[in-house]
C-alpha cells in the first residue's frame, strides 16, 4: 500500500503559546527569550512580525534590540509549552494512533489507510490545522509525502499555515533546485564541506558520486545522498519509555563557577531530577556519567559503573566522586550534566505500587527504605509541584 505520512510543525511554537494567554502581543513584534543579563539572553522563538525585522532564533538580545527596538520580550515558561505540546499531541491522536513525536513542536503521523475515514490527504490536513487552531489557538504547517524525510521537507516550504505535498516523483522540480542548506540533516559544517566539493543544490547532491561522498563524509554522506534522492524507509515509530537508553539532565550556568561546593549543589539538583525521571519510568541503571564544559568550550565526560539503581543518593554519590577527581579550579565551568544509563530489562514492566511504597514493614535494608522515601517524595511533587521538597544542601545554599 502507498504510504501517506504527515509532518505537523507548530509555527513559532513558544511565542504562539504565549499569545494564547497574552493576546495583547498579537500583531506586534514579540519573542520568547531569557534574561539579557545572563547567557540565556538569546531568542528562543520570534513571531513572524519580529522576523520581518530580521530577528532570528539564537540571536542575542542586544543585537535584536538594535534591529527591532519595540520588540516585546517574554521569558520562557517551559512547563506551559510542554502542556500545550501534550494538548497538540492529544488532538493528533484523534486522527491516527501511529504518531512519532520528533520534538516539542512537531510530529510525524502515519496516515496510511486513513483516507477511508477522513477523506483525501489534503482535506485531512486542513481538518487537523483547523482543529488545532479552534481548540488551542495555535497555528501549524503540514507536510505530506510517502516518507518521513520528504514530509519534513514539505512542512518547511510554506510557513506559516501551509499545507504542502511533496511526492518522490516531484522532487526534481520542487526539491532539487533548493540549496543544500535547506535540506533537513545538513548543518553548517556539512554544507561547507559540500560546497568545497562544488555541491550547491540538493539536485547536485542527489546526482553526485555516492562512494566519494562516503569517503569524505562517512555514514552521513550515504544518508544525505539517499535523502536527496527522496529515499527514506524509516517507519513512523511511537516512542515508549522502554526505548529510553539514557536519562540525563544538564544546565548551562548563568555565570561561570570555579568553586567545587557550588558545583556539588548544582549536581545534587540535577541528580534529583534524573532520579525522579528514572523512578517515573521504573528504570534502574548501572552507569553514571558526568559532563563538564568549561568557559573555553572544551569539555570532558567521565563515567563509572555502580550497582543498578534509580536512587538520587547513589546517582549523586557516583557523580560527586567523579567530579572531585576531575575538578580543576583553574578552569571556570560553564555547563554541568549528569546521566544514568545501562538500564536492566527485567524490571521495566514492573509497576511501582503506591501500597508497596507506603506500607510499614520490618525491612532493614537502608536502600529499600530510601527507595520508598524517594518514591513517596515523587508522589508529593506530582501533586504539589517539583519545588515543594528540596534537599537540605539545596535549601542551605539558597539561604546563603
UniProtKB/Swiss-Prot annotation:
Record site feature (Substrate discrimination), residues: 14
Molecular function GO labels: damaged DNA binding; DNA-directed DNA polymerase activity; magnesium ion binding
Protein name according to UniProt: DNA polymerase IV
Active-site residues (renumbered): 106
Classification via SUPFAM superfamilies: DNA/RNA polymerases, Lesion bypass DNA polymerase (Y-family), little finger domain
Job of this protein: Poorly processive, error-prone DNA polymerase involved in untargeted mutagenesis. Copies undamaged DNA at stalled replication forks, which arise in vivo from mismatched or misaligned primer ends. These misaligned primers can be extended by PolIV. Exhibits no 3'-5' exonuclease (proofreading) activity. May be involved in translesional synthesis, in conjunction with the beta clamp from PolIII.
Taxonomic lineage: Bacteria, Bacillati, Bacillota, Clostridia, Eubacteriales
Keywords: Cytoplasm, DNA damage, DNA repair, DNA replication, DNA-binding, DNA-directed DNA polymerase, Magnesium, Metal-binding, Mutator protein, Nucleotidyltransferase, Transferase
Transmembrane segments annotated in the record for this chain: none
DNA-binding recorded as keyword: yes
Cofactor: Mg(2+)
Family annotation (Pfam families): IMS, IMS_C, IMS_HHH_1
Subunit structure: Monomer.
Every UmuC domain range: 5-187
